[in-house]
Each structure stands twice: as structure tokens, then as C-alpha cells.
Amino acid sequence: GNDIHLLKRGVCAAGHKSLWAAEFGGLPPNDFFSSLDPLLDGFIFRLFNGTYTAAEPAGYLDRYWAEKWGLSAKVIVGIGAFDCHMGAVGGQIEPYYLSKVMGTSTCDMLVAPAGEMKGKWIRGICGQVPGSIIPGMIGMEAGQSAFGDAYAWYRTLLSWPLQQLHASSLIDAATATALRNEISDRMIVNLSREAATLPLDETDELAIDWLNGRRTPDANQLLTAAVSNLNLGTGAPQLFKAVVEGTCFGAKAIADRFIDEGIPVKGLIGLGGVAKKSPYIMQVMADVMNMPIRIHKTEQTCAIGAAMFAATAAGLYEKVEDAMHAMGQGFDTVYVPDPLRSRVYAKRYSQYKQLGAYIEGSYN
């Protein structure tokens, strides 16, 4: 049709990005919008007044596109949701297990039965929306602004001399490019191997991971990172180790926020590129968090999750949990925390929080 008011809106985007809350009547009232700008007076009346989960059909494939793609016009089109939320389903999320999609940044998701969340409002996260991940459960989202990007930043920093090879009179341009690419491609792997051999001590180099601000807990994108405990003996592997630990401390701050707000975290589920590619980082994550992290088999959890929702919307499964059980690929690796290292990391995490508080206080 051509009536925008008939378009079915997904609760995932509406709840996490448009302030939709059914228990408060849906979208914010008109007074809210007009208080932001008089031009927004009446804006609310042009928006939607209902939402749907990703397990429900939005309608059927338009005849034009059906003919163009050689498909049936009876193909059901499902309601949309955010990539990582579908990825959490593709990664077989379970109640009270923190599902972490780890790539350039992280998206951390947790689900809990709606009946167990009554009266609980989690401060400082990125949204708490009924049905945004699994229908019938409360979907909660958090995340880090930089995760893989933090490691990429460090690689770029160390690679600066390599960028100057093109000006060398000793090698030709093609050799310079090949050499630069080879070293750059191996750098994170080599740094990880060396960092894994380093002893762990309370006085080691310490990094705050806010290289792209802080998303959770308590979003503040203007905050910046910091490094302490540097000395003349600090080498590239030691500093890389600090950056990795900093990102894992940032991850622990998210888990602790849920726990402090009365939401248990029973374990971790690792998804995404970093989870699949870096055993060193995942072991540090397990040690810092002091809980196991299961790595899902599939490298395309978002696509698998979308397929699970599509199968549910099409009626192949009664509920998305059934699709998860039938279509899920399971886990291929479990990283278990080392008790001795976890005890040291508990002390270093306290130092991380102290340094972070100082940095944030200095900014304020």
C-alpha cells in the first residue's frame, strides 16, 4: 500500500532508538517533542502507534520485486530488528547469559523473562525493551565503543614507520607495499603470541579503553583513553597486553552494572570476528570476568539469526526458541578462567576503576 501508517514497525528499533515504551503509552507525548523545538509540535501524530517483534510477519513480497527476483508473491517478509540483536538469537542466547558480539566495537545483550523483570530498571545501559531480542522476554543492550578498533589503532600506531617505506631508495614500491602488508597482517597475531607469554603482575602497564568514548555503563562519548605505569622497560607486547586487558576491564564494567542492578550474569557467549580469531583475547576475557565464555560455531550469527526469525515469521516454528534449537549450530570452544590469574585481575580491575574515575573526574 501507500499509507505509511500501515507500515508495521519493529519493537527493536522503536524501543532502543525511538523511546518507545508500551507501559508508558508508546512514544513520548507531543509535549516532549514540542519542548525540544516548536517545529516538532504535532510531529508525534505523524508517527506510529504500535510495534511488532521480529518473529511476526510484516506482509508479503511486493509483486514487482517478486517478478524481478523470480520469487513467489506469497513469500512472507518478516519484521526487522538490529543486526546484533538477531546475532544474539543466531548465537543461541539464553536468559541471564551475556551475549557479546565482538568486532570493531561490542554489542552486549542479555535477556530475562518478563515476569522476573517487573519493577527493575537497569541504569546506564543502552535500552531495556520487551521483545527486542526474544518475544516474551526483556531485551537489554549495552556495549563498548571500541574493541577491535582499539587493537587496530595500536597496529596503526606501530605501523607508522612502515608507511614511510615508499620513500626508501633501497627497495622498489611493490616490495615496500608487500612488506608493509605482510608485517601489518601478522602484527596482532605476533603481539598476541608474545603478550600471552608475559608474566602477570599488579604493577603492569594499565590502560583505560575509552579510545572512542564510553558507551556503557553510563554513556559519555566525550571521554578519552589513558595509559599508566609506563617505564623504559615497556615494549610493544607489554603495551598491547595493557590495551587488551583494558578492553576486557571495560567488558567487566558492563557485566558488573547488570549484577549491581540485580540482574545475574551466569556466563558469557562470544560472537563475532574477535571471538573467533583471537584465543589470547578471549582467555584474558574469561580470566578478567572470572567466568567461562562459550564461542559460537558460526561466523555469521546475524545471518543465522535473521533466518531463524524468518522461519518463525513464516510459520515453520511456533516460536523463535524452537527455531534456535533446530537451526542453532552450537559452540566449538569454551574458555575457562584461570583462578590464579583471575585473582590478580581482580586487583588490577580495581586499579582500572580508580584510574577511570580520575580521568572522568579530570574531564568533568
Question: Predicted regions span which residues?
Answer:
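Short beta-strand-to-turn element immediately C-terminal to the catalytic PLP-Schiff-base lysine
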Residues: 1, 91-92, 108-112
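Short glycine-aspartate micro-motif
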Residues: 74-81, 90, 97-101, 107, ...
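Generic recognition of flexible, low-complexity loop/linker segments
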Residues: 65, 74-77, 87-89, 95-97, ...
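Flexible, glycine/threonine-enriched loop-and-boundary segments that flank and lead into catalytic domains
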Residues: 82-88, 264
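Short helix-loop-beta connector
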Residues: 72, 94-95, 263-266
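Gly/Ser/Thr-rich active-site cleft segment
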Residues: 1-81, 208-212, 240, 244
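Glycine/Thr-rich phosphate-binding loops that ligate phosphate moieties of nucleotide
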Residues: 18, 25-26, 52-60, 78-79, ...
